[in-house]
Amino acid sequence: MFTAGNIKWTLGQDRSYLATKDEVLIHFDHCLDVVKQRVQVDEYFGWALESHDESDGIVRLTCTSSDGQLMVVEAKRLIKASGFGVVPNDPLEVSSARVVSVSPDFCDMRGDEMRASDTPVWVVGGGKTGMDTAHALITEYPGREVNLVAGSGTFFSSRDRLFPAGGRRWWGGTLVTGIFMELGRRFDGTNETDVATWLRDTYGTWLTPTTGNYLLGLLSESENKTIAAGLTEVIMDHVVDAVDRNGETDLVFRSGLAKTIQPGSWIVNCTGYMLRDDQPYEPYVSDSGAVVSVQPRSATLHLTSYMGYFLTHLLFLDKIRDVPLYELDAPDLRKKSNAAFPYTLGSLTMHNLSLIVDSVPNKVFLDCGLDLDRWYPPPRPTSTSILFVGGAPRFAKLTCGVRSSGHTAGGESRRSTKSVRAGRRQPPPVPVLVMRR
């Protein structure tokens, strides 16, 4: 699960085992070693691509090293796999001198520094990073005060319902492909609130009173119960600052409210990593078909790992220009309609996969180690695959329409956006994609 191509894990653990950060990094090294046995790999760590241009069937890359060296590379094809461009989170900048502001990227929640303290911890961020951090603190330091500032709240896919363990893999749970298919049938471009409620109530788990966010994160029911029982306080707001005034220390929130906290409290920045950096727009494939770009500004599938896998196959099959994939400017849409974002992305994924499945050899899908349906024994993924292939023509016949300028969804008016482009080569004059059967 979650690997490169069809390269298997070597941990020797049960399939339900959750790999640690170090084990994931070791697996990446293993994947590179396996790839080196198949093709020639030249490593240029410390180098960065500055620019590229195409001329006479050649792609010319200009690269620079960390020490200022220049290198020009000529190739027939170029794959720019920058992905989500995730960078570590810095600690939140706060005015107070009486708190300890840290980031889980630079401060181990189970490390000596945190262990030597017994002051309260404020976890800022209600997404998956916040949940994992809160869970680590609650289980590592029983009885310690741990608080959560959860923003507008988040719901998660229930690991127990999507990836049941043991014998339930044969008869329990629901395959992810089936959920995406149902999501694609339900979402019409205007009913994101209804779809969110259906998805949350049927396959989700959550601990906050409101759940305004969903980003495909997984959480088990036991993890959720442990966190909910171990939290001292949950505040549905956003931290703006921590200030010292009148002899006290206050957390200041976006709403204008404040909360007096104990001096020496820890503030842990868990505000997330995804779709935060404003990368410049770039189409997923160049006009010549020689350059493929894997990043969220022209997303064709829900995860950049899937994009890298399938777009690379289309590139080397010389079909990357022939298959009319839709692209989605994911960061742009998320800024303009966070509520509609995950369901638009899910519908887009099913539509594009329905086009890809008709354009590549079956082996491409059979060798895809990213396929989450592989969690289940062979008979179950096979039956879902048959349903998907049978339903592919229905997804392929979805059409684009204009969302009326006065339309409101989820109680909020929505401005025009260029977030979705059809076929990439001829962007439609309509501002928003509306899926219609």
Language model features: what each stretch is:
Residues 1-30, 149-212:
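Glycine-rich active-site loop/strand segments that organize a redox cofactor
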